[in-house]
């Protein structure tokens, strides 16, 4: 009976060591439904309980502009990338939690003389590398839906704040506008797992010891039984 109790404990301990990944969901959402477009900052509509999400903001190089139901700006760079021309927001998991971000989805629209290129960067490398490359916007004023998949080797199990910046440049006029809408982040926010490596090692050692101990007596018993049978013939 004791052996079966130990096996049961080892099995249940092994299950507790397994991490079952959660399905990705919307963890933060900026709708801008009630926005005029020219607010200095605009708050998040919803976010996971264990996740803090900042207001949406602009870089110091651009100016607010009107755009009902969006978050808009003008004075974008008319040439190459300007590190002060961007939209930005920050995410931070609460203590004891970690953040995985799978992708960003949003809508964007330029005026007829707005930006022609955009890219994302983040604070993990001090805004040095592009995330997903440089993207060119068609020369029209249509609303487009964009999706940016994030590499799992960089944006998995983050336990500190991260700031994203969406840069726009190559505007056809300094008065040309560019606006974003309906921005959502998909991923998971989960509790930091307890350190479990030592528990797994102990469980395996106990199992090995039990199996070895039980196998040895069984072998001796079979040998003795066979010997006694031969003697009785």
Residue ranges of predicted features:
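Boundary/junction segments of secreted and surface-exposed precursor proteins
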Residues: 21-40
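Surface-exposed, low-complexity/disordered Ser/Thr/Gly/Pro/Asn-rich loops and linkers
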Residues: 56-92
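Extended extracellular/luminal ectodomain segments enriched in beta-structured repeat modules
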Residues: 94-103
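Extended, low-complexity, turn-rich repeat/linker tracts enriched in Gly/Pro/Ser/Thr and Asp/Glu
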Residues: 95, 108-117
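Short, surface-exposed beta-strand/strand-loop-strand elements in extracellular ectodomains
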Residues: 116-126
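Terminal, low-complexity interaction segments
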Residues: 133-191
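A short, hydrophobic C-terminal helix/tail in secreted or cell-surface proteins
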Residues: 194-212
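C-terminal membrane-anchoring or membrane-association module
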Residues: 209-233
């Amino acid at each position: 009976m004791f052996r079966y109790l130990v096996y049961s404990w080892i099995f249940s301990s092994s299950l507790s060591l397994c991490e079952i990944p959660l399905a990705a969901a919307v963890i933060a959402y900026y709708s801008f439904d009630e926005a005029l477009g020219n607010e200095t900052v605009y708050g998040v509509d919803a976010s996971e309980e264990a996740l803090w999400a900042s207001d949406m903001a602009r870089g110091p190089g651009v100016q607010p502009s009107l755009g009902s139901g969006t978050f808009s700006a003008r004075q974008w760079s008319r040439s190459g990338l300007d590190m002060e021309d961007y939209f930005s927001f920050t995410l931070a998991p609460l203590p004891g939690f970690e953040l995985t971000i799978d992708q960003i989805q949003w809508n964007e629209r330029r005026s007829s003389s707005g930006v022609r290129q955009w890219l994302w960067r983040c604070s993990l490398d001090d805004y040095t590398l592009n995330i997903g490359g440089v993207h060119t916007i068609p020369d029209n004023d249509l609303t487009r839906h964009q999706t940016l998949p994030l590499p799992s080797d960089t944006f998995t199990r983050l336990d500190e704040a991260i700031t994203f910046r969406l840069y726009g440049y190559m505007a056809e006029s300094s008065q040309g506008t560019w606006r974003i809408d309906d921005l959502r982040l998909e991923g998971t926010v989960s509790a930091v797992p307890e350190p479990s490596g030592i528990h797994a090692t102990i469980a395996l050692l106990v199992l090995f010891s039990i199996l070895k101990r039980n196998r040895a007596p069984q072998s001796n018993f079979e040998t003795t039984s066979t010997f006694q049978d031969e003697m009785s013939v």
